[in-house]
Amino acid sequence: MSHTAEIPMVPGSESPLELKPLKAVDPKTVYHRRAQRLLSLAKDSPLADYFELCRRVVAIQARLAAEADFGQLLAWGKDEAIPLSHLGSEADSYWQGLLQQLLSDLLPQVDEDMARVLRLLMQQSPEQLTSWGSALRQGHMSEVPARFSLFIWAAMGVYWSHWAPMVIKRIDQRKVVQQNLCPICGCHPVASVIVDQPRAGLRYLHCSLCESEWHYIRAHCTSCGQDKGTTLWSFDDAKAQVRIESCDECHGYTKMLFVEKSPLMDVAADDLATLMLDSELNAKGFGATTVNPLLLAHETEQ
């Protein structure tokens, strides 16, 4: 349950072919489809056990997205470039409440080793959780114990993804400029997605936290913005559904998921399922400039 009546609506164009700088998604749908995709991909994965853990976490996210009480949208910077980047301490209280619900639901579904991890996380102080949450959102993954990151991010994701669509409807998208971080919450993308709506071949970056998508011109590095020295890699098939775009300028890379060719793909699940592509690019001296909510690698591990 939530309240948004106090936020004025900004009218937009009605053209179905208009290029939308921002695309809102329904978090319930995203989490439900992600859980299904994880279940499907686990069948042929050497990481089947981890895929199953992630599936259970995402399934709980879907339930929380549908049933949790999110209160009222807190003061947000509608005049700021990134409106949901600084929500204050009340937001911490809400996502930490979601975290406790997530851990309680997950506890009976895991083995004893993982249960000990969950119980330890449940015992952390609000101040500690606030510090860890802030570090993760700022990309400082190494400041948070790796065994806790998946669950903290999952809880924050439920909260931020709930409010993002409502904020997107209420900002002037004409002021949104191309950028490498999410224009709504300021977090890194998971990967690029190539879509067929409103026009075929458009690229959007998909946010790792609030699940929003924002347009980004193809053949430009999604990290440094350079339009020279980018290479599109495809290791087995030139028309593969997952490819990688690397940049010779900053030596970063991002995956490109051609969801127009395979609508069942999910940006987080399919990124996780193609870690061998990351290994290939790492061996060539490139590093990921993205964040996967299901695999929050420490900076030194990227």
Curated annotation (Swiss-Prot):
Broad class of where this protein is predominantly found: cytoplasm
Annotated InterPro entries: FdhE-like_sf, FdhE_C, FdhE_central, FdhE_N, Formate_DH_accessory
One Pfam family cited in the UniProt record for this chain: FdhE_C
Intracellular or extracellular location(s): Cytoplasm
Presence of the UniProt keyword Cytoplasm in the record: yes
GO BP field: protein maturation
Annotated family: Belongs to the FdhE family.
Record-given protein name: Protein FdhE homolog
Organism: Shewanella sp. (strain MR-4)
UniProt gene name: fdhE
